Amino acid sequence: MEHVKVGAERAGKDWRDIEIVNRAMVHVTDNKEEGRALFRSHFAPYFSNPVYNRFLEWCGYPDVAAEIREGWAARDRERTTGAFSNEVIDEIGVIGSTTEVQARIREDANAGITTSIISPIGRVELDVAYQTFEPFRGDRFEL
């Protein structure tokens, strides 16, 4: 939020009046290890792209970005996907039970996110998409 506040100030605006959008990569599951494996398989190649790799580094994960870059260059899939510790995945992704993912989106809102875009992790079957969106239906979720 620090960057948003600085940018708003430079533009002569109050950061609290700006819509702050976050695309949340969500996977609803009771098996967090399976969810983390899904995250690794989809986001290691994504963050191997130089543009997104630099973004990951800018976001405060320089060691992860370097490991992905080096693993990708070596064509070592295990090294590339293994660059993400569980802790990093839990910071970047939103993985867990219905209650856990709802709580995380509420935490983000309390931190200043005004609009959360709920996105399934990767290309998913329709039933998994419904499972992802279900906890955020209007009759099941409020801030």
Question: How should each PLM-predicted stretch be described?
Answer:
Residues 1-143:
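Active-site-adjacent structural elements that line small-molecule/cofactor binding pockets in enzymes
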